[in-house]
Design a protein with these regions (language model features):
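Double-stranded beta-helix
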Residues: 166-227, 231, 251, 270
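Conserved double-stranded beta-helix
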Residues: 86-96, 107-173, 178
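Feature marks short, surface-exposed loop/turn motifs that line or immediately flank catalytic pockets
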Residues: 63, 131, 165, 180, ...
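A generic structural micro-feature
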Residues: 149-151, 203-204, 234-238
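Conserved hydrophobic/aromatic beta-strand scaffold that supports enzyme active sites
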Residues: 37, 53, 156-160, 209-211, ...
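Active-site donor-binding loop signature of nucleotide-sugar glycosyltransferases
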Residues: 58, 176, 246
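N-terminal auxiliary "cap/dimerization" subdomain that precedes the catalytic jelly-roll/cupin core
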Residues: 2-121, 215
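Non-heme Fe(II)/2-oxoglutarate
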Residues: 2-33, 76-78, 219-221, 225-280
Length: 280
């Protein structure tokens, strides 16, 4: 089955607003962290709850991330040949074993368990690949605003496939913005050239942005309510990152999105999430 017949049509990256309005959502920040963390320090957990993000954390060596980069290079060639673009590779863990292996990777899962607890669902995998001079930006937004899920207890692990810095349009966070809950947004204007479709206007009134500079193989972790975005990549270098999404097992997904979820730690006692096997 071709990529375009599966992932690009099964789940929309951006749902219609009407579909989201049908879901009653609890979009408040819930303090995260376990009493006895095994990988993160208590200070890191406190910083996450205060700022809404952690960065940078080294997870993979240069040789290890080079293997993942070669896989992505091949995947990108396949997707573009099928008519997709560098932002359209989403929910790939349900089709590609290599992405599933990253979603369930012990080093990554250990990080999120220290924030979310023992019972964890991995439900998202989306490559955000900014090609050189592609002109597209990601406007200021909150992830939870896009998702038919409740309550808002998802964290995103952003894995740098390439180096990400100011020159090639790394992500930016507004510290503490997650404490304001679900913020008012507007549909993006065409001249924004937004990869997505929501914009929180005048976002910097909530604080001064912080650049998420990462070397390939490093990750950052952010809350689903943390304001973030990125500018257009005007450099000669590509900037690719893989977003991996995790939530507590008590989160409920609607519009069929529970089909995305894989139990990466503990159990899903209610059996809400599909827990698809590793693709081969």
């Amino acid at each position: 089955m071709a990529f375009g017949e599966n992932l690009m049509t099964q789940f929309k990256i951006v749902l219609e607003n009407q579909a989201l309005d049908q879901v009653e959502r609890d979009l408040r920040f819930h303090t995260l962290g376990v009493a006895q963390p095994q990988t993160l320090t208590p200070e890191q957990i406190a910083a996450f709850n205060r700022d809404g993000f952690l960065k940078p954390i080294r997870l993979f060596s240069e040789d290890e991330i080079a293997v993942h980069r070669r896989f992505f290079d091949g995947l990108l060639a396949e997707v573009t040949a099928a008519g997709g673009d560098s932002y359209s590779i989403s929910t790939a863990h349900l089709k590609y074993g290599d992405v599933y292996d990253l979603l369930t990777h012990p080093r990554i899962v250990a990080l999120v368990k220290d924030l979310l607890g023992e019972n964890v669902i991995g439900w998202g995998s989306h490559f955000f690949c900014k090609m050189p001079h592609d002109g597209k930006r990601v406007s200021w937004h909150q992830d939870a605003s896009y998702w038919p899920m409740t309550p808002s207890k998802t964290v995103t692990v952003w894995l740098a496939i390439d180096d990400a810095d100011v020159e090639n349009a790394c992500m930016r966070f507004i510290p503490g913005s997650h404490h304001y809950g679900h913020l008012t947004w507007q549909l993006s204007e065409d001249d924004e050239r937004n990869v997505l479709n929501q914009t929180v206007p005048d976002a910097e009134r909530f604080g001064a942005p912080v650049d998420d500079v990462l070397k390939a193989g490093e990750v950052s972790i952010h809350s689903d309510l943390t304001l973030h975005g990125s500018e257009a990549n005007e450099s000669d270098r590509r900037r690719c990152g893989l977003t991996l999404r995790y939530c507590t097992a008590d989160v409920r997904a609607y519009q069929g999105w529970n089909a995305k979820g894989v139990v990466v730690s503990g159990a899903d006692a209610a059996g809400h999430w599909a827990n698809a096997p590793r693709p081969v």
